[in-house]
UniProtKB/Swiss-Prot annotation:
Official protein name in the record: Hemoglobin subunit beta
Positions of post-translational N-acetylvaline modification: V1
UniProt-listed GO biological process terms: hydrogen peroxide catabolic process
Sites of S-nitrosocysteine modification: C93
Amino acid sequence: VHLTAEEKAAVTALWGKVNVDEVGGEALGRLLVVYPWTQRFFDSFGDLSSPDAVMGNPKVKAHGKKVLNSFSEGLKNLDNLKGTFAKLSELHCDKLHVDPENFKLLGNVLVCVLAHHFGKEFTPQVQAAYQKVVAGVATALAHKYH
């Protein structure tokens, strides 16, 4: 991902304030609610029968935290996202058979959740930088797909 020095600084500064536990669970939960077909990849998560069930599900929250911890690693390696996410790409492609379009959807949901949490601090410039990052991460995660 090509970011200017200002964009990198904006992304890093905001990310330092993110509560990964809270935002991760909320982002994954919103993905599962807004795009219910994505739930098929989470059969082992138990009750996903309603928005309240999804948002209160401890397995959704735990996996959301795991997802954002991986995203944090990506932010530390913006110049090598493909390398950073190579193993996760392989796992999601070969073993889990996740539709790579879902990575884009989750990235966009994450941007919305960040905007909701940070309000005016999430300026158009910060949003534009995050859109670049989530697009880069989605591309890296889709890299192993043929």
